[in-house]
Amino acid sequence: VEPLAPHEKVYVDSEFAEDENHGELGCEECHGGNPEDPNWKTAHEGVVKDPSYPDASSSCGQCHEDIAEHYETSLHISLAAFRKVTENRLGSDPAALDALSQAREAHCSGCHSSCGQCHISRPESVEGGLLEAHLFQKRPPMFQVCTACHGSRVEKEYLGKNAGIPPDIHKEKYFKCNKCHTAQQMHGDGNNYGNRYEVENGPKCIDCHEEIYSDKSENAAQHNDHKDKLSCQVCHSMPYKNCYACHVGKDDQGLAYFKTKGSILNFKIGINPAQNEKRPEKFVTVRHVPVDPNTFKFYSDIRLKNFDTLPTWKLATPHNIRRQTPQNKTCNACHGNAQLFLGKNDVKPEYADANAKVIVPPEMVPPKVDE
């Protein structure tokens, strides 16, 4: 997404004052400050740029109490998944945890998204700025908010920006993010989830494609044969981005940065590392995440001592769904095709232990069938 011009970031349209809901509020009722003070410097004392972060109860929560009640458990606010995985890999050393906290504050916290950073302004991670001159957006605009943050993977997959890979079939049907990812999911439900795949009201393909197992479906036999054995993406997604070896730090001016050793487009089927009642499938698509034992080494020489406790190939739900794909063109396009599956040779020897439960041994690759 293109950065906004300086004046665009702060311009408030007079039309906002005519809003029958939010326009009736004085600026100070959300942002603080003293409108009665004739001195502009002292009048701005206590002014808050984003009244909805880190606590929305005194701003949005005054009217939207039912949503603000669950605010802190929304993964967009809590970033619980990042805390969980980094602390699991790091261990319990207090000094290391303190250094990790500094690293998270410098790098991870910029990815949170508050009420305001979806409904009023762009997220801070893309330099912020008002969306529509401070007019509240009930439905956050997809390209200025959703893909502004979820750009390198989701946007490129969904819009077909990866070379040689077509866009998601749902994009061709003009679906926006909220068609699958509802407000209820985004706002949280009060439960402290460890990652997005645990969210109870998260999207499921079957929510819309409920007929695929019925006799009326032309592919009912294939869908029933593979039910609970494969995730939908195993058959219906295309190659997606996999990143490697991310390292974070600060430059000479104290500005946070990150760099990786690159990325590749690939497609791999692995053993489900998060198999549960909600996701019972044995085989799922897996994506390589760019964590490295020395990702946070810049900060007090942190090394992720328990690196092998979690895989570097994680459960993935790529946003490049197609009805027909190379792997579902025929049965034996997948059956007996070991190259589609995450094998021992796809993983560096030093990461073999971390991915032991995800790697598909040769004997588990489905054999060829008579077609």
Residue positions per predicted region:
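C-type cytochrome heme-c attachment and multiheme electron-transfer modules
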Residues: 1-126, 135-371
